[in-house]
From Swiss-Prot:
DNA-dependent RNA polymerase catalyzes the transcription of DNA into RNA using the four ribonucleoside triphosphates as substrates. It is an enzyme of class 2 (transferase). GO terms for biological process: DNA-templated transcription. Residues 1173-1187 have a biased composition (Basic and acidic residues). Belongs to the RNA polymerase beta chain family. Its EC number is 2.7.7.6. This is DNA-directed RNA polymerase subunit beta. The keyword Transferase applies.
Amino acid sequence: MATESTTNTTTIIARADQHDIDLHKASDRVNFGSIKEPIDVPYLLGVQTDSFDWLIGSDRWKARVEEDEKNGTNTVAHTSGLDEVFNEISPIENFAQTMSLTFSDPYFEEPRHTVQECKEKDYTYSAPLYVNAEFENGDTGEIKSQTVFMGDFPLQTPHGTFIIGGTERVIVSQLVRSPGVYFDRQQDRTSDKEVFGAKIIPSRGAWLEFEIDKKDQPQVRVDRKRKQSAIVFLMAIGMTKSEIAQAFKDYPLVLDALEKETLETQDEALVDLYRKIRPADTPTPEAGKNLLDSFYFNTKRYDLARVGRYKINRKLGVEADFNDRSLHQEDIIATIKYLVALHDGAATFPGKRNGEDVDLRVDVDDIDHFGNRRIRQVGELIQNQLRTGLSRMERVVRERMTTQDAEAITPQSLINIRPVNATIKEFFGTSQLSQFMDQNNPLSGVTNKRRLSALGPGGLSRDRASMEVRDVHPSHFGRMCPIESPEGPNIGLIGSLATFGRVNPFGFIETPYRKVVNGHVTDEVEYMTADRDLDHVIAQANQELDENGNFVSKSALARVGEEEAVDVPVSSVDYMDVSPRQMVSLGASLIPFLEHDEGHRALMGTNMQRQAVPLIESERPLVGTGSEWRAANDSGDVIKSEKDGVVTYVSADLIRVMNDDGTTSSYKLAKFQRSNQTTCYNQRPIIHDGERVEAGSVLADGPAIQKGDLALGKNLLIAFMPWNGYNYEDAVIISQRLVQDDTLSSIHIEEYEIDARETKLGAEEITRDLPNVGEDAVANLDERGIIRIGAEVEAGDILVGKVTPKGETELTPEERLLRAIFGEKSREVRDTSLRVPHGETGTVIGVKEITREDAEEDGDELPNGVNQMIRVYIAQHRKITVGDKLSGRHGNKGCISRILPEEDMPFLADGTPVDIMLNPLGVPSRMNLGQVLELHLGWIAHSGWDISLDPNMEAEWKKLVPSGAEKAEPNTPVATPVFDGVKPEVLKGLLSTTLPNRDGDRLVGPDGKATLFDGRTGEPYTKPISVGYMYMLKLHHLVDDKIHARSTGPYSMITQQPLGGKAQFGGQRFGEMEVWALEAYGAAYTLHEMMTTKSDDVDGRVRVYGAIVKGDNLPPAGIPESFKVLLKEMQSLSLNVEVLNAEGVAIDMKDEDDDPASSADDLGFNIGARPDAAAKEDQKAEEPEYQ
């Protein structure tokens, strides 16, 4: 057998070597871009994974630190986040400082469960964190050391997400103002004089603000309290008058203020300062000194952070060590000097950088500049939570040091890990920055992980954010995308990291530039932060170069500082952009011809790509931008080979590769799993048995991915033409073919859960034996009462049978006898089965059952009081239908208004019917011409082309066609990179050289238009029509999820009006404006009926229902419940409101026979109840009462 297997292996390898195989490692698109990028796009999820690696000090982070030290660079923080936070808190000392507790060397054990197990069983993917704790008793000199368990710490999956309680979540990076020193200029309210101010903002601690007021006096504000003299503050921190005079000898403004100051000693200054900060307390020099120390000079209370120290050093030209995170006298002196220089209008300020004397530019700071805004990544956000938890734990430790016997104390007895665990759990579960991962498609997942949010704790609030903060800023270039942002109230507050952007150890976003030396562009790439951009002249990436990398023209369009772009001589250019797509995010870089779309529409196109639903059969775009490969590969939804080797086994759910190093790797594929957005997550192998693969080769496609390329929609034949008004106002007409062939069909998987609990009246039971339910209703349930897999179910069908004990009344003797004979079985129960909700349908594809016995065996955890939990998964096959939303990639969205038979659609001369008709009026006013250019290039890619078919051999456009793109077969995918795409003249030329069809005809002319024929009459249309292939997406706004109808259902308890919304099975609101409409028509009876019988006349609606059932005339309406509520509200305002009868006597509005309950009893039915009402009892929306 061994020999045979060896022979087989040899054969396989030989077969793999025989033919030159596509190793699935790069996109096979024909690229029309002319600019070569000197570097690859950085790993798209690096913004998440690198930060978490730093936090936990992983091996990947250690390797990067080693490389950093070897290269002598500073691209990585050299102390891990956990080490930092444990070093900060150590040592914890008691109040007498006779005992101390020190932490060191945190490490993780292996995670208890795999990522897949956590998803299936609702666990949190985490690993136990241990730390070495050392307790020292100063009195005896005794040291006790222990390894202490610090709780389970959530771990990141390889793709930058966290599994919390079984659901996949993402921690979004936060944009915040950086700690440091900031200078500003404001107009004084009373005079027109400019007032200059400075703020020293720490990462943690009190602010310190300086100001030169309208009288030219230097003032200080301590901890946002009252203003006082800056001279007094300098004296309070220990400077004498002579030292102040010496330090500010070149600053007359400060010397004038010093002369006027009457206080002479530090003690007087401290007393004066304390009196103004704490006016209620008795001022003493000691109290003043303690207050100042605790505000600014206590490292436990005040922390500039490394980034704050870096910013202060750069701004003021001081040279303190980055790890020196406290404030010093020199910083305060330099701040006041800079402020005075700013006030005096000086252009430069003397300082030091890298040990050299330099002249720093004096200017006020722009708070919206990306040199002053930094990113708090996932690692730092978790570290801050850990710091909060440990500081709470510190208080507990101090208390225990004083209360416990010193001899018996061990580190374990002092430490209580509950506050630490609670803080981290709260952050992952409820923080604004911990988001339910968007798994709609691979792009939405990547974008979610690259999102930058200015909201959240310590950030802005959307109500107070000004236009300036939201606006696009020049410093965003290459760092944050100017296009991708939400359309609602969060516009400008939530952005996306630019394609080439990366975050440096201080949290500032860097973007790469090519170095230019004497007009020669090198391949040397340098990453720069936004504040360094200002010091250089930077040319655009599309500046023309010759083959040696020299500028072709004598001048170049370049950015100089914050000014508009200007033409400069090429000799003065310092740097050049690395790529035209450097400015935009991944989502925007996927829009072909982005440069021809108006900004708002590009924003919509970018956002709508994230809403595209993965289709049953994915198809990559014919017209792409070249970014599709990277987007799909870095998303984590494709399976890639870990090592070089040969594929030995392929099935739908498993791929096995024999690696060249003799090992074997197995790759499990996800099959028909439910995503967070209920879409179908399914992976398909794209390699064959015997194929050779390299490390990084794509083995299997994920959802919305084809051949390793992102494939969000379908290439469809589009005609821009109106059709009987059915595509008016962005409506879309589609062909029946798209429905029949499942071209735009998708699978959606819903999860339904039910649990059997212990109640006060006994245990609930999962059973097939349900009261008052016929056999046909339980036909698809197995003997346990659970639906069988494969069953087709509709709304109201039972998925899991469950009975709940009813409340018992006093038993009669006969009942007691039956109870004694038959035991518990004769107890009264009610049916609380899990049913398919209203409007849902589908096929059962999976059932998961967890019982308490199973849970105890497997170590699973069921919530308290739950005996059994069952989950049912139902898959829906949704075809495209009228009301669904379709969209292109250019913000051209529309709702399907008609599905025409294929034979009625307009057709080309060879009989090919078009798939979709779009309204041409949707283009000019919206200025998204990218869709028209995509249409033409789509036709070219579909037909194939050969530029030699143009008889003019010297045509200018041919020179612009890149090598390798001279000809192509039909259905060749092409790439037109953003800002470097196909030129209009090339597009025109290619349209005239498309390959003819088998009849030798070119159906579309050089102008991109074709003669179309009316499908109904066969007559040609009078004018040629733009026809071509466009990539269309089916968005997640599906009519099946939105359509809703109500007959009778739940009512609000207070107003007795029907609830609103599909989730509550609510009614249509007949609002104020609708009432006006009926008033305008004088439809008095309809209006009266709407506001009484059809709404909240409780008794009337029951009687009307009865009258309709019995065929009687409708009874007169009663008094609406909301009118009674209004009376009660007026009475609660102490207004005496009474109802008088004809004789003028006050009467009660509720009559004896005005009882809805008795009316319902008389009729023998209850109109407010629904079959699945019992199942929804737990959902108390607005306290519904079933009337």
